[in-house]
């Protein structure tokens, strides 16, 4: 009994941390076949699940921190094993034991102190909006725009928040932001294993939404969309949530947004993991892009359910990935391979990783990386003044 007890305790800890899915696994190895890591280095999700089954989690190794939670393995699994849940359970156990990569520790500190992973002042969260006629949210407004952390602070991603605001203003949408009242949604730090910090961030956000009379939330990030839609209900919070790619289609179909300018470029669309595989949103972004005059949409071979992860999920966006192991480099090659001039996506993490990969190219101008809102902003053009000059 004495030799079995430690393993049983570990198994109980894994179950308590949400990793009980290992019980369904019969070690067929399909997860390893589809995992993007195996395109760039050896990695076995099957081995991690096996460790869970035997109560022998290797929480001090690097492997438990590699998973990007892209969703490819549960999609391919014939038994429907939630392999990502097993990985996250290992991370929770490791975090509780004080074992985690330094970047994750730094991020947790930043989130706890300022409500964002960058450690930027909370008081400046809404500063991006000052030049774009964006009002503070008040009860009764049509929608709350929740840009997320990186569009609020990162110089490249601020352009996405600005494009979104400009589009909403052009469409006559009555919207506002909460600015410094917002926290990070908490999705990625939860997947990185810090469950208690996630709960704190989520509860503070939910309180801010309720206190300000929020009913409908518009998001730029699929990670925010996923968390608000699928995880905040754990706290009995149910708000209507819509991703900008979906809302764009609604505005266009309702006649509130006119795409009049031609965009004569060949583009390809990258399905973000948390918009596509995790939430099934594939058609709306494509329907929006198809309505842009002059735009030619070319599909990559790995599209929709088979989309190649950019490498940013599961907390990996905060960790350095060595050159030669970046999924985003492979994705950029795929985009160029189909003759695309622009790689379009709808996720801040994807844009960050693709921009880094683009800048590492010998000819970094060979392809552009854009958010779908930036394309639509160009398609609606500048607002023309009334004939009387008003």
Locations of the language-model features?
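A broadly conserved sequence feature marking short terminus-proximal activation segments
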Residues: 1-3, 23-45, 277-281
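Ferredoxin-type iron-sulfur electron-transfer modules in oxidoreductases and energy-metabolism complexes
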Residues: 2-17, 38-66, 70-72, 80-113, ...
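Iron-sulfur-cluster electron-transfer modules
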Residues: 19-22, 39, 49-220, 225-232, ...
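Short cysteine clusters
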Residues: 25-31, 35, 67-73, 77-78, ...
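Short, structured patches in soluble enzyme cores that scaffold and shape functional sites
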Residues: 147, 243-245, 271
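Cofactor-cradling patches in redox/metallo enzymes
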Residues: 151-243, 274-291, 296-390
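C-terminal amphipathic alpha-helical segment
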Residues: 253-289
């Amino acid at each position: 009994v004495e030799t079995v007890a430690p393993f049983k305790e570990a198994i109980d800890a894994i179950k308590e941390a949400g990793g009980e899915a290992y019980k369904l696994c019969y070690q067929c190895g399909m997860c390893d076949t589809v995992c993007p890591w195996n395109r760039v280095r050896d990695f076995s999700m099957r081995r991690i699940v096996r460790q869970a089954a035997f109560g022998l989690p290797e929480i001090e190794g690097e492997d438990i921190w590699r998973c990007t939670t892209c969703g490819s393995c549960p999609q391919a699994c014939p038994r429907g094993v939630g392999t990502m849940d097993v990985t996250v359970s290992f991370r929770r156990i490791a975090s509780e034991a004080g074992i985690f990569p330094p970047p994750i520790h730094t991020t947790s500190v930043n989130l706890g102190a300022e409500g964002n992973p960058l450690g930027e002042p909370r008081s400046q969260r809404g500063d991006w909006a000052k030049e774009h006629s964006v009002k503070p949210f008040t009860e009764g407004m049509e929608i709350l725009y929740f840009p997320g952390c990186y569009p609020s602070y990162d110089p490249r991603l601020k352009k996405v928040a600005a494009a979104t605001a400009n589009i909403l203003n052009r469409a006559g949408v009555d919207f506002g932001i909460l600015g410094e009242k917002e926290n990070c949604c908490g999705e990625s730090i939860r997947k990185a294993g810090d469950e208690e910090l996630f709960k704190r961030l989520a509860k503070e956000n939910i309180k801010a939404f309720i206190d300000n009379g929020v009913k409908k939330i518009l998001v730029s990030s699929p990670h925010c969309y996923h968390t608000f839609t699928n995880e905040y209900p754990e706290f009995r919070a149910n708000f209507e949530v819509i991703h900008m790619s979906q809302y764009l289609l609604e505005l266009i179909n309702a006649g509130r947004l006119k795409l009049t300018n031609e965009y004569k470029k060949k583009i390809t669309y990258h399905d973000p993991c948390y918009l596509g595989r995790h939430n099934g949103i594939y058609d709306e972004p494509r329907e929006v892009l198809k309505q842009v005059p002059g735009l030619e949409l070319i599909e990559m071979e790995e599209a929709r359910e088979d989309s190649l992860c950019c490498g940013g999920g599961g907390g990996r966006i905060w960790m350095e990935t060595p050159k030669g192991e970046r999924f985003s480099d492979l994705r950029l090659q795929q985009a160029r391979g189909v003759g695309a001039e622009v790689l379009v996506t709808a996720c801040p993490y994807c844009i960050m990783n693709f921009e880094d990969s683009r800048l590492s190219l010998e000819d970094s101008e060979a392809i552009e990386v854009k958010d779908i809102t930036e394309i639509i902003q160009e398609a609606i053009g500048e607002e023309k003044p009334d004939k009387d000059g008003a």
